[in-house]
Amino acid sequence: MNVRPEEPGWPLRDRLVVSKGHASCMLYTVLAHRGYFAPAELKTFRQIDSRLQGHPCMLKTPGVDMSTGPLGHGTSVALGMALAARLLEKSYWTYVLLGDGDLNEGQTWEAIMAAAKFKPERLVALIDYNKVQLDGPSEQIMPMDPLPEKRRAFNWNVAPAVYDGHSIVEVLKSFDWVKGQRQWPAAVIYKTHKGQGVSFMEDNAQWHGAVIDDATYTKARQELLQTLQKLEELV
């Protein structure tokens, strides 16, 4: 993304709306590594008076383009940002990251229809499709399949492949596709597993926001460190 960490409010920056605001720890980690704040501040996550709260706040945290939390708002906000770019004759990109719960919300689909009508340039939906949400498997809560066909039926330009959201190579391929598009709005779907990398959490809705104890913390940390080591070997 075209951003300036030293100038978070730069008018020409690309925008990212993390509609699934409960994934804030992921966003904060990326922001820290991009230089918006020191990585040491990550240790204050969800503490009183910390800038890094459980849901991202654009008034507190540099690099956060939109405060999010209640699901379903992100696509509407991103649409507004993309339309603003057109009105202001700016060329920034607007990305919105959605999860399964977002796709259950009626407002999301209203925004999807509106975006197809107004066709703002450089509006891209990134869909984290793990088929698990707060209350259980999405198939039991509110099935979304066939998701690619549904988005196309709403006149979105959907990537021809469903990408592996856990593969950096696949993610980079998806953005190669995005950057080559001229039909808007566009959407990319990523197949993921909730809790990937921690064996006892993977695809298990019971760990959606659950608190771990010392034993599970130790096990999770060991597994994640093993994954990190493998990634560093690839680099």
Regions found by a protein language model. Name each.
Residues 168-235:
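Glycine/aspartate-rich loop-and-adjacent alpha/beta segment that forms the canonical ThDP
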Residues 37, 143, 212, 216:
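Short acidic-hydrophobic sequence patches enriched in Asp/Glu that either
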